[in-house]
């Protein structure tokens, strides 16, 4: 697919994100994608998905033991993020 485009999306934020290894990974992804001119969306800071919030996770994330899943959106979560992701993708 020589004309296909590639995009990256970072992980969501998490509890104690600021200064964490998770933040370092997000920043590294942004830096590497920038070096190769690959569009990347910073979901941790701009995604409007609040994985660090217990109430938010109960509503927008898949059910998990002790409500600890911070990665997998449910259908409501996907509906919420769709507008944000679509807006990013349509820039390209």
Task: Please give the residue ranges for each predicted region.
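Catalytic His-Asp segment of secreted/periplasmic serine-dependent ester chemistry enzymes
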Residues: 13-92
């Amino acid at each position: 697919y020589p004309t296909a485009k590639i995009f990256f999306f970072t992980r969501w934020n998490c509890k104690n994100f600021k200064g964490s290894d998770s933040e370092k990974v997000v920043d590294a992804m942004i830096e590497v994608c920038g070096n190769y001119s690959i569009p990347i969306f910073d979901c941790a800071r701009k995604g409007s998905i609040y994985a660090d919030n217990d109430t938010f996770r109960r509503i927008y994330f898949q059910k998990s033991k002790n409500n600890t899943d911070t990665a997998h959106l449910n259908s409501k979560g996907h509906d919420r993020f769709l507008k944000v992701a679509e807006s990013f993708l349509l820039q390209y």
